[in-house]
A protein has these predicted regions:
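Catalytic-domain carbohydrate-binding cleft regions of carbohydrate-active enzymes
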Residues: 1-198
Length: 198
């Protein structure tokens, strides 16, 4: 089965950015303009965040994702959604702080609902790996722990996180076995040691 990766941001250089912005489908800032930010520390261009509190956006977005899922996609990994600035203002009036966790759930739920619409009529189960979550995330089948460090002491933290997730009702949970990246004492990414890698 093929698993696709998706994130809730759109690069400001994308040909679809202007359309989404003009339709009011991107999270705004307190000045009423699209909130643009760097999604990672190494990003070279800014992004806007899709506003999953806007029902008009959901109507516009679902057919686009559904068309891809209908090609036979077995699972979707919903990545990111935590980087929205605190001065954000969502369609439903939530501030960046109020909507921070709500966005992560609505994003995953939207994708999961699309998966269910496509998969259940085929007699298949929808599968979504969600990175971030909130109240209600237990209704989505699986959680992924995100980009974990390869340091051996980090494995204990990941295990605690997985146990906590299971106690919160999340039935399936996974992580990057052996870690995804390594950082040195200054916080710079570096190559894992042979022991950490294995």
């Amino acid at each position: 089965h093929l698993c696709l990766w998706i994130f809730p941001y759109i690069d400001e250089n994308s040909k679809y950015f202007k359309e989404a912005e003009e339709k009011g489908f991107l999270v705004k800032n307190t000045k009423g303009v699209t909130s643009r930010f760097y999604s990672t520390a190494t990003s070279t261009s800014k992004v806007g965040c899709f506003d999953f509190t806007n029902p008009h956006f959901i109507e516009w977005y679902k057919p686009k994702v559904r068309s891809v899922v209908s090609m036979g996609i077995g699972a979707v990994k919903t990545d990111f959604s935590e980087a929205v600035p605190e001065d954000a203002v969502y369609f439903d009036g939530s501030t960046g702080i109020q909507g921070h966790n709500k966005l992560t759930f609505l994003y995953a739920k939207t994708i999961y609902d699309i998966m269910a619409e496509v998969k259940i009529p085929l007699g298949e189960l929808p599968m979504l790996w969600g990175r971030s979550g909130y109240a209600g995330s237990h209704t989505i089948p699986a959680a992924w722990a995100g980009d974990s460090s390869t340091h051996l002491n980090n494995h204990a933290c990941i295990l605690r996180g997985g146990l906590s997730a299971s106690m919160s009702g999340i039935p399936f949970w996974g992580f990057d076995m052996g870690g995804f990246y390594n950082t040195d004492h200054e916080g710079y990414e570096c190559v894992p040691t042979d022991e950490e890698y294995i």
